[in-house]
Swiss-Prot record:
PANTHER family: ELONGATION FACTOR TS, ELONGATION FACTOR TS, MITOCHONDRIAL. Associates with the EF-Tu.GDP complex and induces the exchange of GDP to GTP. It remains bound to the aminoacyl-tRNA.EF-Tu.GTP complex up to the GTP hydrolysis stage on the ribosome. This is Elongation factor Ts. The gene is tsf. HAMAP family: EF_Ts. Belongs to the EF-Ts family. Residues 82-85 are annotated as: Involved in Mg(2+) ion dislocation from EF-Tu. Disulfide bonds: none annotated.
Length: 301
């Protein structure tokens, strides 16, 4: 049997637009023959899904799932083309199953895609292909993450359409004593509202810090004040910046007189990590063109 290399799989995917798992299976079934693999994909009806894979998918839902003992959690973003499909029961049921699979996998899109499908038929990747064919829209498992703690992992979904699914999802991992579930949920709600860039100042992206410092330095120099004064201005403005983007430094939304860090200390809790997904974040949505839309409707009439 021919060796199925990553290069062969990549070549077939570029020719057909098929998913990674489908392309690999096609090559295995056809002993590495590209032409036969292409025909195999067409025969299996996967070309229909492949054609739809070029369409922008920026809607959908974010799902969170916790383990029974509350010590681990998974968060998944599954995209579709329209909000209408995201409210489809098939889509939601499948996403719930994918979130369960994510809880058992290693927290990467690749691992979850290759995991067993919740309906028992093939992989999660196969399940998504079947949904594309059934519902008629492109869908993408965009991102996946997992958190674990010796204490507790809490979850929150903002404006949930069904329990555990919404357009914003947050996981928070805490260690310590006290009511970690309650503290974690409150901090998760805070994160959903404020979108911090990092848990602590030390964890901020150095490039982001340097960029902000350059901007603030230029602004301060425009004041024409002495260097000593400018230096103090920069320090003060950087502290304000940290309060805006660092979770531990932010005023706690449920009690603005204290920071999130102070709230957690009062609760006897230590933040081990957080994940915050906002649906479609960073995905460019296709702009509707009215003229093209009318032309398409006229052509189909």
């Amino acid at each position: 049997m021919a060796e199925i290399t990553a290069a062969l799989v990549k070549e077939l995917r570029e020719k057909t637009g098929a998913g990674m798992m489908d392309a690999k299976k096609a090559l295995v079934e056809n002993n590495g023959d590209q032409a036969a693999a292409i025909e195999w994909l067409r025969a299996k009806g996967l070309s229909k899904a492949a054609k739809k894979s070029d369409r922008a998918a920026a809607e959908g839902l974010v799902a969170v799932k916790l383990s029974d003992d509350g010590k681990s959690g998974a968060i998944v973003e599954l995209n579709a083309e329209t909000d209408f499909v995201a409210r489809n029961e098939i889509f939601q049921k499948s996403l719930d199953g994918i979130a369960v699979a994510a809880l058992k996998a290693d927290g990467t899109v690749e691992a979850v895609s290759a995991a067993a499908s919740p309906d028992g038929e093939g992989s999660v990747d196969d399940l998504i292909k079947r949904m594309i064919a059934t519902i008629g829209e492109n869908m993408t498992l965009r991102r996946v993450a997992k958190l674990s703690a010796t204490g507790r992992v809490a979850a929150y979904t903002h404006n949930a359409v069904v329990p555990g699914m919404g357009k914003v999802g947050v996981l928070v991992a805490l260690d310590g004593s006290g009511d970690l579930e309650d503290a974690g949920r409150k901090v998760a709600m805070h994160i959903a509202a404020t979108s911090p860039a990092a848990a602590t100042t030390e964890e901020l992206d150095p490039a982001l810090v340097e960029s902000e410092k350059r901007v603030l330095t230029e602004q301060a120099r425009e004041s024409g004040k002495p260097d000593a004064v400018i230096e103090k201005m920069i320090v003060g403005r950087m502290q304000k910046f940290y309060k805006e983007v660092v979770l531990a430094e932010q005023p706690f939304i449920m009690d603005p007189d204290k920071t999130v860090g102070e709230f957690l200390k009062e609760q006897g809790a230590t933040l081990k990590g957080f994940v915050h997904y906002k649906l479609g974040e960073g995905v460019e949505k296709a702009a509707d063109n009215f003229a093209d839309e009318v032309a398409a409707l006229t052509k189909g009439a």
